[in-house]
Amino acid sequence: MPNYTLYYFNGRGRAEICRMLMAAAGVQYTDKRFEFNEWDKYRNDMPSMCVPVLDIDGQNKMPETMAIARYLARENGYYGKNNMDMFRIDYICDCFYEILHDYMRYFHTKNGRFMQGSGTDMSPDMDPTQMTSYIQNRYLDTCRRILSFLERTLEMRNGGKEFFMGDQMMLCDMMCYCCLENPMLEDQTTFNNFPKLMSLWKRVASHPKITPYLKKRNNTNW
């Protein structure tokens, strides 16, 4: 078994899917967390100067959330049985990641961390309140566009009563939990029209390989 070290800020954010996959698979790893004010110590050691990054045996540093997640899912049996399974899992994951991406920009902008580069159609003269409102609206538009599609996609398999791929939890189901956790905590009403997705979210949380992790993980606000 390789020696893994996962680098990310002290929050769930874009790294939580990687942590959850390793927890579900029983993979041991070092969870290297740091605060925002410590980022300069690590930035230049990261391949693309961003995190999360997964270090493997101190020799390979793998960047990008979904590249790491797919690697871990393939290694541990959470990525389907054939190419068509993987295709379906991929597009479901990519849809959830769109929501996570826009939510994280909104969350950090409203907390004063992102003041630049949040959209190519934004005016550089936009004040912080306008910027936050713009990014929030974009996030909500993404939710409306994607969640209805994912609700229908889930329903295609056994009426949406199990997981996206049937009776076995896969990467895309864990993405549902990780990508919607903070948005649901912030405003549950955004998701009231998607009961099958909300039931899936609860199924993942109650899965015997996930519940112990959720109980013992670090308690952070994002």
From Swiss-Prot:
Residues 82-222 form the GST C-terminal domain. S-crystallins are structural components of squids and octopi eye lens. Contains relatively little if any GST activity. It comes from the Eukaryota. The keyword Phosphoprotein does not apply. Pfam families: GST_C_3, GST_N. GO terms for biological process: glutathione metabolic process. InterPro entries: Glutathione-S-Trfase_C-like, Glutathione-S-Trfase_C_sf, Glutathione_S-Trfase, Glutathione_S-Trfase_N, GST_C, GST_superfamily, S-crystallin, Thioredoxin-like_sf. Belongs to the GST superfamily. Lens. It comes from Nototodarus sloanii. Disulfide bonds: none annotated. Residues 2-80 form the GST N-terminal domain. This is S-crystallin SL20-1. Keywords: Eye lens protein.
